[in-house]
């Protein structure tokens, strides 16, 4: 089959998936549909929860392994959609629907590239993995299926990157902060205001800058994104809760940043939700990155998180669609973007020597 036929298959599958609500933790019906198509294309597969994987029939444990990966879950549709988010509509080159851009286009394009590469000469094994719960970094997503997969040497993650290679990705750590005071009547000089107790620490957090800045990822960034305190106007609040969003570059591990904050923010109590989502990258001299450069693609660093953070091997993001369309109303992807992605994946993989 020519690329056009594979593109048609990709578009058909994408429309089917858009029509199936697959918000994180509810991907079972979408996984069923994917399994149906894998059977139709004679691709024996494994399944763990709502994660699916397919390995090449000429598997050789003595060869290195490349994984193509994308996720099947979506976020919830925002209120400002002007269309039915679960009704796939094609208007010319545009396909509208929830998950079309993030990450449906990458999902179907990586699968078609996998199908093509089964018939091309390779010195490596190829594996395709569709993962669940990516949008929430859930325990039943990639981390659940990873122990069941063979050893992987390198991966391409099909996130929307405007088909440019994101060879580095910032890590993420979410911290819950608490300040404590003593309640009292606001009209009298009594009580200890928990909001005021937190102010010095929050001002320090706002003004502090980590010294080591990354060429690809920039500086490690900390933002207070949620704050909750007080019950009514005439009561001095005795507790304050806030959330810190921390985006780390490759120079700072999440554990180090957390311990550093605990030493500096002495008025507040801090609790990290997880340390596992570290910054990740692939060396610029890696054969796959060199193939990207030969193709005229421009490597960059991504501030957003993906399943790449959970991969203990070299990986980078490369996929159709634009990151700015993700999680937005009237989400869309272009058919031409999917076709170009399939062609690009095949170019990178066909001449690759691992």
For the regions a language model picked out, list residue spans one by one.
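Buried hydrophobic packing segments
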Residues: 34, 107-117, 145, 198-201, ...
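A structural signal for short hydrophobic beta-strand segments in well-ordered beta-sheet cores
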Residues: 45, 88-90, 224-227
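Metal-dependent amide/peptide-bond hydrolase catalytic core
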Residues: 2-5, 167, 174-354
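Acidic/histidine-rich catalytic neighborhood of metal-dependent amide-processing enzymes
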Residues: 108-174, 178
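Short glycine/proline-enriched coil/turn segments at helix->beta-strand junctions
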Residues: 39-44, 48-50, 62-63, 119-123, ...
């Amino acid at each position: 089959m020519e690329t056009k036929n594979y593109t048609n298959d990709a578009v058909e599958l994408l429309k089917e998936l858009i029509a199936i609500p697959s918000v994180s933790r509810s991907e079972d019906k979408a996984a069923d549909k994917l399994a149906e198509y894998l059977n139709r294309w004679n691709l024996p597969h494994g399944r763990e929860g709502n994660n699916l994987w397919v390995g090449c029939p000429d598997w050789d444990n003595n060869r290195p392994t490349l994984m193509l990966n994308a996720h099947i879950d979506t976020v919830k549709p925002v209120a400002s959609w002007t269309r039915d988010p679960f009704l796939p509509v094609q208007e010319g080159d545009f396909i509208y629907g929830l998950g079309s851009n993030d990450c449906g286009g990458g999902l179907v394009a990586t699968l078609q590239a996998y199908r093509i590469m089964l018939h091309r000469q390779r010195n490596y094994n190829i594996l395709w993995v569709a993962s669940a719960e990516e949008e929430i970094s859930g325990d039943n997503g990639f981390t659940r299926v990873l122990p069941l997969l063979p050893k992987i040497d390198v991966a391409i993650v099909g996130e929307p990157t405007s088909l440019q290679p994101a060879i580095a990705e910032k890590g993420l750590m979410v911290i819950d902060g608490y300040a404590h005071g003593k309640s009292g009547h606001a009209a009298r000089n009594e009580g200890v205001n928990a909001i005021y107790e937190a102010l010095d620490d929050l001002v320090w957090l706002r003004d502090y800058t980590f010294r080591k800045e990354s060429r690809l990822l920039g500086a490690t960034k900390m933002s207070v994104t949620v704050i909750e305190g007080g019950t009514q106007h005439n009561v001095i609040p005795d507790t304050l809760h806030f959330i810190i969003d921390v985006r780390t570059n490759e120079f700072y591990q999440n554990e180090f940043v957390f311990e550093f904050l605990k030493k500096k923010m002495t008025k507040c109590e801090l609790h990290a939700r997880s340390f596992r989502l570290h910054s990740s990258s692939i060396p610029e001299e890696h054969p796959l990155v060199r193939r990207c450069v030969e193709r005229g693609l421009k490597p960059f660093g991504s501030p957003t998180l993906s399943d790449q953070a959970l991969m203990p091997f070299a990986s980078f993001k490369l996929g159709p669609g634009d990151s700015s369309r993700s999680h937005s109303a009237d989400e869309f992807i272009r058919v031409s973007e999917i076709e170009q992605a399939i062609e690009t994946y095949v170019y990178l993989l066909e001449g690759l020597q691992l």
